[in-house]
Design a protein with these regions (language model features):
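Short N-terminal alpha-helical targeting/association segments
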Residues: 4-6
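Phosphate- and other anionic-substrate recognition elements at nucleic-acid/protein interfaces
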Residues: 8, 15-18, 24-222
């Protein structure tokens, strides 16, 4: 009898509407509570360069990613090659101190025909990695091809195409982006890391110390 009475009220239009609304708010509250308890991750993305180095900060909570900072480190005014490396270390350390990232995602140098340019780029990347490891931040490298594939699905995508896709994915205003695409390349590295770590089996193993980096990359210190 009680069950029949309950069913009678349930199928009344007003009662059913109120029941659905209350159920919706209960479920919504549970999801908000779960999201509030999800730990925040801050990913620092870096696009290494011997003249201009791009960096970005990606804030991740659960499955939501948000770009909070985009910028460049301009080393062109420092003409001494060794002092420019020092400047990279100092500036990357400042970014780390300001934003307190949990992880670093950095683009690996590409292999080109100009050996001198490759050497300079490799040094710049190594110094940025050293700055992160000095602050106990795990580092993960991603090849340019892998980053482009993760963002656009095309390993031959241009910098402009990568930037445009990031604007769509992260709802960024293209008119507010830095003119130098090194910044969006850095964001691409960070977003690639976010996607890869969402599927741990596909992610590259991070470097957790300078010794770990040297062990896995002996060719970079010859």
């Amino acid at each position: 009898m009680r069950l029949q009475r309950y069913a009678f009220y349930l199928y009344q239009p007003n009662f059913f509407r109120i029941f659905c609304i209350l159920s919706f708010f209960v479920i919504l509250q549970k999801f908000e509570s779960m999201e509030a308890n999800t730990p925040e991750r801050i990913i620092l993305g870096i696009d290494p360069g011997s003249n201009v180095m791009g960096y970005s900060i990606l804030r991740v909570v659960g499955r939501k990613a948000e770009c909070t900072t985009l910028g460049i480190i301009d080393i062109r005014r420092v003409h001494d090659p060794y002092l420019s490396l020092q400047q990279i270390f100092v500036e990357v350390s400042k970014v780390i101190a300001q934003y307190l990232p949990d992880e670093l995602a950095i683009e690996a140098p590409f292999f080109g025909k100009n050996v001198q340019s490759m050497l300079k780029l490799g040094r710049a990347q190594g110094v940025a990695i050293a700055a992160a490891i000095t602050h106990d931040i795990p580092v993960t490298e991603y090849a340019p091809l892998k980053i482009k594939m993760a963002i656009t699905g095309n390993g031959a995508a241009s910098k402009e195409q990568v930037a445009a896709m990031l604007c769509r994915l992260l709802k960024l205003d293209a008119t507010t982006l830095p003119k130098k695409l090194d910044a969006t390349d850095a964001l691409a590295a960070a977003y690639c890391h976010y996607l890869q770590t969402a599927h741990p089996m596909a992610a590259d193993k991070p470097y957790r110390s300078w010794k770990d980096f040297l062990t896995k990359n002996p060719q970079k210190v010859k």
